[in-house]
Amino acid sequence: MKLAAFPKCFMDQLVVERSMSLFDWIAMASDLPVEGLEFHHGFLETLDEAYLEGVRSALERRHLQMPMLCASPDFTKPDPEERHREVEREKRLISVTAFLGGSYCRVLSGQRRPEVSREQGALWVVESIRELLDYAAEKGVVLAMENHYKDNYWTHPEFAQRREVYLEILNQIDSPWLGAQYDPSNAILAGEDPIELLELVKRRVVTVHASDRFLKPGHTLEELRSVEDSAGYAAILSHGVVGQGLNNYPRIFRMLREAGYDGWISIEDGINGLGEILESAEFLRPLMQGQVKRPPETPRPRNPQPGG
């Protein structure tokens, strides 16, 4: 397995404010104990070839790979012309992935719009993804459908956030060019068991997000549900250092290895800076190598007395 980093701590600086360039992030990340960097499509200032060539050169100078591009297509838009534009935009990002040397490009279902039924939305999503498969094959890029919560810059949460909808879409498309991007924290946010989801998709996992989200003290999942349909992430939701949250990562990695997974693990962390990404990397590396840390045993008293 190889380790990549995704900088949640710098999302707005890279995407919205543009106070940090992608080249700045590549330089900063070169000191992290990772082999690659996962990019969000919003990190790219332009898709012009000259700019992309500069990005590729910067990665090469720092001996870093760009294995996976985090794209956010929205295939539940009711207007067919808008859905077509989303398909064409995703194709462009597949091409960018290949140009930068990546092998995986994220694909999503889209936003869970109140006016779109489950049946209609699933139909649109399956149709849209199928339109991408031949192009993905041509470029040698596998589409990775994430069990997603919500893009940072969406209004509504993921249409396929719930497991049954996610699997309904994924299982309709039997292609080597579509796999699962597994994120255990997103399953928890959906009110579901991440281990149960992994058991169902483990043979199709092509990329993994390592994250540990948590609700800020005093807040509940029910409260999160009530504020999901607003722009961006809820203020009560936060990322934490991987290994310090609710996910059972030793078990997750054991299941991945048993399924033959040997791909990329991308740290989705660092909300409070690079130090947290480093902590996450130090936690994950032994698990990736098959080393499971066991809790220390509680010392037992010698020669216990009856009733003692």
Model-derived features: where do they sit?
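Active-site cleft segment of glycoside hydrolase catalytic domains centered on the general acid/base Glu
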Residues: 116-129, 153-160
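Active-site groove signature of glycoside hydrolases
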Residues: 97-118, 139-152, 266-267
